[in-house]
């Protein structure tokens, strides 16, 4: 097996996503599998993790009217194969439409751990680190409220930072 074999499985998973084929996505996944993503409930685990995540992602996308979701992978930043384990870090871009406007989320990172089973490489776990969406047509998907706490000698100070992308 070559270093690119785990990437073949990663691409098969993404191709299944782009076709809206949760069965193909599940076929690339190990049992059990883990997913860590930015949408609630944030962690999925078990034999149906990829299908459960896909269902929850579609529900989240439906609320603001997002459609035509597609992922594009860049060239891997890191592929490490050690026996029957592999670790892949690849930049990714997500595109979708909201009310007829194209939205691109660039700068995302897709990190994947794989296991080599009898029938080939399978995804054991993946995590998605969100990028930046531009232009933005739906604040519901990418509004983030982050609270930072800074402590001084005398009293704690709290800063509430709110990031909103608005229609251009």
Predicted feature locations:
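Short, low-complexity N-terminal intrinsically disordered segments enriched in polar/charged residues
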Residues: 1-31, 48, 122, 142-168
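Generic short beta-strand segments
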Residues: 55, 90-97
């Amino acid at each position: 097996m070559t270093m690119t074999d785990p990437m073949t499985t990663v691409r098969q998973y993404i191709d299944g996503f782009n076709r809206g084929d949760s069965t193909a996505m599940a076929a690339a996944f190990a049992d059990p599998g883990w997913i860590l993503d930015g949408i609630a409930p944030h962690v999925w685990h078990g034999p149906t993790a990829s299908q459960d995540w896909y269902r929850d992602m579609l529900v989240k996308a439906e609320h603001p009217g997002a459609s035509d979701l597609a992922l594009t992978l860049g060239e891997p930043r890191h592929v490490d194969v050690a026996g029957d384990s592999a670790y892949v870090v690849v930049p990714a871009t997500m595109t979708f439409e909201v009310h007829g406007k194209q939205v691109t989320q660039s700068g995302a990172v897709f990190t994947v751990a794989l296991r080599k089973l009898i029938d080939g490489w399978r995804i054991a776990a993946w995590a998605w680190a969100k990028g930046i969406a531009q232009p933005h047509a739906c604040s519901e998907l990418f509004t983030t409220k982050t609270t930072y706490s800074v402590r001084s000698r005398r009293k704690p100070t709290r800063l509430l930072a709110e990031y909103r992308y608005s229609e251009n």
